[in-house]
A protein has these predicted regions:
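Early extracytoplasmic/lumenal segment of secretory-pathway proteins
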Residues: 23-87
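Short beta-strand->loop
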Residues: 29-32, 94-103, 113, 116-118, 129-131, 137, 143, 230-254, ...
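A structural signal for short loop-to-beta-strand junctions that line the ligand-binding cleft
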Residues: 72-77, 95-127, 143, 153-155
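A bilobed periplasmic-binding-protein/Venus flytrap-type ligand-binding module shared by bacterial periplasmic
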Residues: 128-133, 255-268, 287-291
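Short helix-loop capping/hinge motifs at secondary-structure junctions, enriched
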Residues: 132-140, 172-181, 266-272
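Ligand-binding pocket segment of bilobal, Venus flytrap-like solute-binding proteins
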Residues: 170, 175-244
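Extracellular/periplasmic juxtamembrane helices and adjacent flexible linkers that interface
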Residues: 278-339
């Protein structure tokens, strides 16, 4: 009988150990490419012992999470663009998180009011101009791009892209629907070619003389500057950077975020919260800048020396959720003006 009790206790301990091991593993649904997030996850595992599995896709993860429901293996969602984060919130796919560290590390305007998603890094939407063909100081505000003096001089990616739509939303927030549409009409009138390609393609077009001015996310400049391809490094050397709307009374440059949240039906919420907290601490915040030239959301962490060398800038501190809420109106304007 004693032997049976001993074996029984051993069996219970084995089961308990198995459950503990199971809990020390996180499943991550990610819109971010593996090479961008793996260095973070490797360090997180070293620090905590919690291992991670990543399912990566550029689209369809929210729909997958919804269809899986309570049976979903997902613990953490990582994505880029406030519009995508808002989809997860709107579909009720994220857990409400109470974390003092997240509240301290992330400014209020870069996280959801209900604590379901959190900004993890920032990227500024900036203007780049040809060093040879546009004088320094000729453009200082995003609104300047609608000035007829730049007719036939501007290249952009399609207005329907999430980055363009977010910028459009920021202009609606700043000026209202009517003035924002006037700006979009002016911008389209100034385009040198049909909107096409990604931000890298706009820089190439400037170098090739197809246009003189473009709108890009700041990290594209870093990627080109340090590219292993000589031609792309040459493109970067042909540019001046303009952080728009920096005047003393102006609102600052439009920013977007990468961000994340804990899946609603996560079985490992405590570990999932630990990961989000880790991503807002100093080590990870610096890593965002070193790997992808993104700015820290944590106000206690300085931008990397490389980012600082591009110049300091003031950001538009509009609550980032406003960008997502105005997305539909922004798209309507984009469609009407043919951007």
């Amino acid at each position: 009988m004693n032997i049976l009790k001993v074996f029984g206790m051993i069996f219970v301990l084995i089961l308990a150990s198995a459950n503990l091991v199971k809990c020390e593993e996180l499943n991550i649904y990610s819109h971010r490419q593996p090479f961008l997030i793996n260095p973070f996850l490797e360090e997180f595992t070293k620090k905590t012992g919690i291992t991670t599995n990543v399912i990566y896709s550029t689209k369809g993860l929210a729909q997958r999470l919804r269809s899986e429901g309570k049976n979903s293996p997902a613990d953490v969602v990582l994505t880029v663009d406030i519009g995508r984060l808002y989809i997860y919130q709107d579909m009720d796919l994220l857990s409400v998180i109470n974390s003092k560290k997240l509240s301290e590390n992330i400014p209020e305007h870069l996280r959801s009011l209900d604590n379901t998603w959190f900004g993890l890094s920032k990227r500024a939407r900036i203007i780049v101009t040809s060093k040879d063909r546009v004088k320094v100081g000729a453009i200082s505000r995003i609104e300047d791009l609608a000035d007829p003096r730049w007719a036939g001089k501007i290249c952009t990616r399609p207005g329907s892209h999430v980055y363009s739509r977010a910028l459009m939303s920021s202009l609606i927030a700043a000026h209202g629907l009517e003035e924002a549409e006037k700006w979009a009409t002016g911008l389209v009138s100034n385009l040198a070619r049909r909107p096409q390609g990604n931000d890298r393609a706009q820089v190439k077009a400037i170098y090739e003389g197809q246009c003189d001015i473009a709108i890009i996310n700041n990290y594209y400049f870093g990627k080109l500057k340090y590219s292993d391809k000589e031609d792309q490094r040459t493109w970067a050397r042909s540019l001046n950077l303009v952080f728009p709307n920096q005047g003393e009374t102006d609102r600052g440059a439009h920013v977007n975020i990468s961000g994340g949240g804990v899946a609603k039906y996560s079985k490992n919420k405590d570990s999932a919260i630990k990961l989000l907290e880790f991503l807002t601490d100093e080590f990870a915040q610096n890593l965002y800048g070193e790997i992808n030239f993104e700015y820290p959301v944590n106000p206690k962490v300085e931008a990397t020396s490389e980012l600082q060398s591009w110049g300091s800038f003031k950001e538009d501190k509009l609550p980032i959720l406003t960008i997502a809420k105005l997305s539909r109106e922004a798209q309507k304007i984009i469609d009407r003006v043919g951007w």
